[in-house]
Amino acid sequence: MAELYLIRHAQASFGTSDYDRLSPLGCRQAGVLGEYFRDYALHVDAVNSGELERQRKTANIVVGLQPDNVHHEIDPRLNEIEIDKVFEHLVPQLVKTSSNLENFVKEGKHSSKDYQKALEIVFKHWVTSDNDYPNLQSWAEYSGNVHRALAEIVANEGSGKTVGVFTSGGTIATVVAHVLGVTGNQVYNFYEPLMNCSVTRLLYSGEKMSLSSFNDHLFIQSLASKSGEGFLTYR
């Protein structure tokens, strides 16, 4: 039996002009995760990530604390959903029937909580819609790319390996939903609760894959409790 760790990137710079960059707190979160892996002898044989800066930087910080050099493979299929494009295409249509989205558009500057409400509406429509929008990647295409990327990682690494995959919430939710046989609106239920730097553990043998743990962030929560600092973040 082999292990696959799906790791959500550390906190990015939400609300700034460069969201993809890790925040100072995000760098600390990634360091805490790297120390956790090192101190508990959680050695990864290979590392994969998307090409986004927040994913690569989180991987680099964690891998830098591993005892041995670990090869880092970058695959754009592990990138986050292009949610800005999803908003751009769907909000003008959905705002006609959603007061929450109407308020979201009118307010302009948004809190994280406001954004989350809008995200749920837009995400669920995108996942369940049969419509094809020009210049917008469909859910079927996105999820298919994610599944193929993961299948290739598993096939390339073989049995008995521990692989770290540094990616984003949408990607992890897509994988977990697929493993559990969940589709449609329910996919969002695995997207919303994912914490920055959380670890989701999958076990695999050949083509068989099972979920061992989801959204584990106790190592960060423990540090937050001891230090009194707010280490736990969703974005």
Which stretches of residues belong to each language-model region?
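General small-molecule cofactor/ligand-binding pocket signal
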Residues: 5, 73-75, 212
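Generic beta-sheet signal
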Residues: 4, 161-167
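Phosphate-coordination/substrate-recognition cap region in phosphate-metabolizing enzymes
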Residues: 35-117
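Active-site catalytic microenvironments for nucleophilic, acid-base chemistry
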Residues: 36, 61-65, 152, 156, ...
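Loop-to-helix element that buttresses phosphate recognition and phosphoryl-transfer chemistry
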Residues: 3-5, 10-64, 138-145
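Acidic, low-complexity terminal tails and accessory targeting/binding regions
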Residues: 81-110, 140, 155-162, 177-235
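Active-site metal-binding loops of divalent metal-dependent hydrolases
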Residues: 10, 169-170, 215-217
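Hydrophobic, aromatic-enriched interface-forming segments
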Residues: 111-157, 166-167
